[in-house]
Amino acid sequence: MNFAEREGSKRYCIQTKHVAILCAVVVGVGLIVGLAVGLTRSCDSSGDGGPGTAPAPSHLPSSTASPSGPPAQDQDICPASEDESGQWKNFRLPDFVNPVHYDLHVKPLLEEDTYTGTVSISINLSAPTRYLWLHLRETRITRLPELKRPSGDQVQVRRCFEYKKQEYVVVEAEEELTPSSGDGLYLLTMEFAGWLNGSLVGFYRTTYTENGQVKSIVATDHEPTDARKSFPCFDEPNKKATYTISITHPKEYGALSNMPVAKEESVDDKWTRTTFEKSVPMSTYLVCFAVHQFDSVKRISNSGKPLTIYVQPEQKHTAEYAANITKSVFDYFEEYFAMNYSLPKLDKIAIPDFGTGAMENWGLITYRETNLLYDPKESASSNQQRVATVVAHELVHQWFGNIVTMDWWEDLWLNEGFASFFEFLGVNHAETDWQMRDQMLLEDVLPVQEDDSLMSSHPIIVTVTTPDEITSVFDGISYSKGSSILRMLEDWIKPENFQKGCQMYLEKYQFKNAKTSDFWAALEEASRLPVKEVMDTWTRQMGYPVLNVNGVKNITQKRFLLDPRANPSQPPSDLGYTWNIPVKWTEDNITSSVLFNRSEKEGITLNSSNPSGNAFLKINPDHIGFYRVNYEVATWDSIATALSLNHKTFSSADRASLIDDAFALARAQLLDYKVALNLTKYLKREENFLPWQRVISAVTYIISMFEDDKELYPMIEEYFQGQVKPIADSLGWNDAGDHVTKLLRSSVLGFACKMGDREALNNASSLFEQWLNGTVSLPVNLRLLVYRYGMQNSGNEISWNYTLEQYQKTSLAQEKEKLLYGLASVKNVTLLSRYLDLLKDTNLIKTQDVFTVIRYISYNSYGKNMAWNWIQLNWDYLVNRYTLNNRNLGRIVTIAEPFNTELQLWQMESFFAKYPQAGAGEKPREQVLETVKNNIEWLKQHRNTIREWFFNLLESG
């Protein structure tokens, strides 16, 4: 699953106990205060335009409204029960019951928004029992289950019931079932019915418009625990089985599933039954089927496999790039892994409303449209890179995840960390000039180091015991930290050994399940190095070290935490928060390495190749290791001087690494902020994408803390306006250059606008006005900048309404997303309030985009408090619409991360106390509370130092 748009659902309401009236009053007062703060800005925020009226949203049938009632069926066939007399009270399924094959048939009734189905499961039983239990949620059993012995004799079923606490349906036989013998299998048959609306998980319907006509598509999304919403199943990843799937669908529709079509049969004049070939053994979360009226774009792999993309007919041309990148990366992975793709075909389909970024269903990958469809005339370079990386990510899964699957969700990183790492290798092969190996620093390594320096982080391998906990581990630690440590590991054991180990692992465990230790064993065999001993320290405890350099060559390690007040020994770790570290360094262009063993408590001394022994050792070149490095102040000063004299002394990745380390160390009170800020003095000569991205990230934190500081904020603005101006002027407001240059231009022009540069803002406003007047077609790589900063600088009600009209008119999802950001950037609280109200209009704002819009509004200084207050006021609505198991709902509370006052912290704590059931949002709540507490302390500790640096700089001219 691609998580970058960062997003299973249970459709039930959670009853919560309200806290004392006083707490409710506190939250209420906080909301009033927050709204009042926003309203004080409304006087001058309407711009110079006259009154306007928002266009009426197009009234399309809603595809994801809450279901009005259950499908027609007998609700009492398998009634809910609290019977806890058996093992079904346990969260995990028993080892003695294992599915071998599913015959699954479904029939979607599109006009009724319901579906019916039948599943017959062949079961191997290794111990006697009278009970069989498997997963089921929301979908209902419509007929008493049937059970047959291996002999074919019928077994009388006494009763069935739902044990909702663990999402099971339990079937009780009249007599004991004896263990299977030989090839004999029990056969359990269940008929069921479910809803197609109200959710973006399980089996659901959504709509799109073609030539003015509203059309429907139905599809599935099952990871991690939502196959049970579509059909009764043993919904755990190590319960692999084969599947024969059939779908009865309207004749004018086509059907897709994991496997190729085996046969199509006419049922009557309205219905066709499509049956698919028997699958290979696979986990339930990979089962997929869809019913559609799409066109296709096809390629053939070097090994002869058909690679097909299904897309709305009007958008067929936008699938060409994805088709090309699919073939290139697919061929590369078949060669790299030395293993052919396992199925006869690979399909992809763009779903108009899709809750995650993409889903790697074996043989039928589903995508959000923004991650598959690219129009070179309308999409930006960043959109193209996004399509390429998501396509590559999902292709990796066809090997890591599908052929070999983690045994349990605690090892999710074996799927997602690997896909996040290899996506860069795949795109690097297909797009050789994109610097994808270096971009891994920007996308994964450095961002997740911030997450992993919190006390509320978690180990890569983490115990999960509920569906909510399973959902919550689809986060930056599993994806980006997983990717980052694989990058370090590949470098340590050498790429050829890493590749060989991956091949051995896939060969040994194909069509099976594996654990992290199995992967370490394969790499140890390939490299003859103590991989498990080293890597356990990176996967079985949270966090990472900072290496302190004493003198020139002596280094010690210590856990790095952003909060200097935190206890570095908590929560307890068997490994004591020490790491076995592959340390690498360069000296006079000579690279050396050593393994820093955690048992060396006093540290180690690096061997110098320079006879004088005084040469500078650049430790962790290109930030290849997942750790930070803190030099002595004198060394940092020398680095600042070297950057000023000739910044190209260091590689672009090293410059990004040094800047990121310095600002992170300063934030953690391990380095004076003056030292970190000195590193930025050279930036007028910086022309590379990597360092600028990390500078912008570091500065964004500082300006978010001082946004309302009327003395200090203008000084920060003035300084960074000056630093970014040379590169901004050099690149200009055009769309020239190669791929990385276009990414750089978008970043630095956006930073210039963010810093209040009048020339940049005027350029954005001028282009915005020309776009409003229809006199110019905006360059694709400037559109987001113009929509955002043109709206921010000169937007009013008329321009806002026009932008909303364009959002409704365009069919390209990537353009819609940019326009949504533009709408969120207006400095007018009345329009922002209207925008927030539109989030409940499912005909206008797709279910997949609601949290995206809230986040965009929170980036607006006028909308920061409004977005947070809207979440609080509409929490019950959001829970009912998305459920607490939705990871996007759980994470939306992180929009409060820039908060930095005791009042804001109090409001957050009161809100969480009022709604204590967090579902998949437990960790995000911990993280945002920790971050806000850190922010409050940060202001106390660092304001004067930072003020002094900027004041002295401006005083000296």
Swiss-Prot record:
GO terms for cellular component: apical part of cell; apical plasma membrane; brush border; cytoplasm; cytoplasmic vesicle; external side of plasma membrane; extracellular exosome; extracellular space. Residues 1-18 are cytoplasmic. Substrate specificity is modulated by calcium which enhances the enzymatic activity for cleavage of acidic residues while reducing its activity with basic residues. Inhibited by aminopeptidase inhibitors amastatin and bestatin. GO terms for molecular function: aminopeptidase activity; glutamyl aminopeptidase activity; metalloaminopeptidase activity; peptide binding; zinc ion binding. Binds 1 zinc ion per subunit. It is a single-pass type II membrane protein. The record marks 221 as: Binds calcium which modulates its enzyme activity. Belongs to the peptidase M1 family. This is Glutamyl aminopeptidase. It comes from Homo sapiens (Human).
